[in-house]
């Protein structure tokens, strides 16, 4: 099936089979599809609704083309990532949570990119924090193994995705490619917290991750529209564990945190995001920093739990709070920045 035939199917609201979607995705990754065709596919799938088979097949092909790092032997290896596209422009919760999860004894291999439909993607924020992302594969692996936290800048690992970069940037909408980012971690990670831009995606993404061989995953979307666990509203969760998917709803009060509005947590850019995160992770927090810290604890707790550090999510949230208030997280961030700086200098020499 070629991409024109696929588009014809999609306009009739017909889902593509896994073999059909694999064929289309390969044509994109090999540079055979035009930008107009890729843009039409993005919009068509978005309007039809991406099926489990379409997402699974596209992710499988993208993984096939990825430049990989093999750290799958590491215990408690986890990624916490959002699809983006929620349009809320909050500070970068998942990136802040990564450092808390790493300080808890898990290992983070965080797959991320620059903001496409938000003002602060994980890569934008990390560069503001002085963390170098333009590392080679060996250096990135050293970060993960020696520092317990490493960042996999998507364009370094998914070179073939360059063909979709133009349409993604020009359309500026959430699309199947937002969904594929979290599904295509190139480091062999099998434990994830994945935030999605619609609660209708929670179970389907959990189903996709099951087909892709994941072990323990929480897929989350909050009732106030966030692609993370919210401080201000209940959060819908689809949890894949031991091959079974269960769906549940989380209220902050369930784990001893008082619900609060998100006022003060919206940021203009990566600089403002970093400033708020440093406030939240410091020992002397402002009122807004305190609120951000609670938001981070809810999300870092999910990562600590799926990593297998604690037996329950509630225990993990308490552990995350202890780490945040103990000040270890900021130290983790600054040590990683220094380590990546040293790696870059040795590369230059």
Curated annotation (Swiss-Prot):
5-phospho-alpha-D-ribose 1-diphosphate binds at residues 82, 85-86, 92-95, 110-118, 122. It catalyses: N-(5-phospho-beta-D-ribosyl)anthranilate + diphosphate = 5-phospho-alpha-D-ribose 1-diphosphate + anthranilate. Anthranilate 1 binds at residues 82, 113. Anthranilate 2 binds at residue 168. Its EC number is 2.4.2.18. GO terms for cellular component: cytosol. Pfam families: Glycos_trans_3N, Glycos_transf_3. GO terms for molecular function: anthranilate phosphoribosyltransferase activity; magnesium ion binding. It comes from the Bacteria. Mg(2+) 2 binds at residues 227-228. Mg(2+) 1 binds at residues 94, 228. It is an enzyme of class 2 (transferase). Keywords: Amino-acid biosynthesis, Aromatic amino acid biosynthesis, Glycosyltransferase, Magnesium, Metal-binding, Transferase, Tryptophan biosynthesis. Its cofactor is Mg(2+). InterPro entries: Anthranilate_Pribosyl_Tfrase, Glycosyl_Trfase_fam3, Glycosyl_Trfase_fam3_N_dom, Glycosyl_Trfase_fam3_N_dom_sf, Nuc_phospho_transferase. The keyword Metal-binding applies. Pathway: Amino-acid biosynthesis; L-tryptophan biosynthesis; L-tryptophan from chorismate: step 2/5. One of its GO terms (biological process) is L-tryptophan biosynthetic process. HAMAP family: TrpD (MF_00211). Belongs to the anthranilate phosphoribosyltransferase family. Catalyzes the transfer of the phosphoribosyl group of 5-phosphorylribose-1-pyrophosphate (PRPP) to anthranilate to yield N-(5'-phosphoribosyl)-anthranilate (PRA). This is Anthranilate phosphoribosyltransferase. It comes from Acinetobacter baumannii (strain SDF). The gene is trpD.
């Amino acid at each position: 099936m070629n991409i024109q035939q696929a588009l014809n199917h999609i306009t009739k609201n017909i889902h593509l089979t896994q073999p059909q979607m694999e064929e289309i995705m390969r044509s994109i990754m090999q540079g055979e599809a035009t930008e107009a065709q890729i843009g039409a596919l993005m919009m068509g799938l978005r309007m039809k609704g991406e099926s489990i088979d379409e997402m699974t097949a596209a992710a499988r092909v993208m993984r096939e083309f990825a430049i990989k790092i093999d750290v799958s032997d590491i215990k408690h290896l986890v990624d916490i990532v959002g699809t983006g596209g929620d349009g809320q422009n909050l500070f970068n919760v998942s990136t802040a949570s990564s450092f808390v999860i790493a300080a808890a004894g898990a290992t983070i291999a965080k797959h991320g990119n620059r903001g496409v439909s938000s003002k602060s993607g994980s890569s934008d924020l990390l560069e503001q924090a002085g963390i170098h992302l333009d590392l080679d594969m060996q250096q990135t692996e050293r970060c993960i193994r020696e520092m317990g936290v490493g960042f996999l800048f998507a364009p370094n690992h998914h070179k073939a995705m360059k063909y979709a970069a133009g349409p993604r940037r020009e359309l500026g909408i959430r699309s199947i490619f937002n969904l594929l980012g979290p599904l295509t971690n190139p480091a062999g990670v099998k434990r994830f917290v994945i935030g999605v831009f619609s609660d209708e995606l929670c179970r389907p993404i959990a189903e996709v991750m099951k087909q892709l061989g994941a072990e323990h995953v929480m897929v989350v979307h909050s009732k106030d529209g966030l692609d993370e666990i919210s401080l201000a509203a209940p959060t819908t969760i689809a949890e894949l564990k031991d091959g079974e998917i269960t769906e549940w709803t989380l209220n902050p009060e369930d784990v001893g945190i008082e619900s609060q509005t998100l006022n003060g947590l919206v940021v203009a850019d990566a600089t403002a995001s970093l400033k708020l995160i440093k406030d939240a992770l410091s020992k002397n927090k402002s009122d807004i920093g305190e609120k951000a810290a609670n938001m981070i604890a809810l999300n870092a707790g999910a990562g600590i739990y799926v990593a297998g550090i604690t037996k329950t999510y509630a225990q993990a949230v308490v552990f995350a709070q202890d780490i945040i208030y103990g000040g270890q997280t900021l130290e983790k961030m600054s040590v990683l920045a220094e380590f990546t700086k040293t790696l870059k200098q040795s590369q230059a020499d």
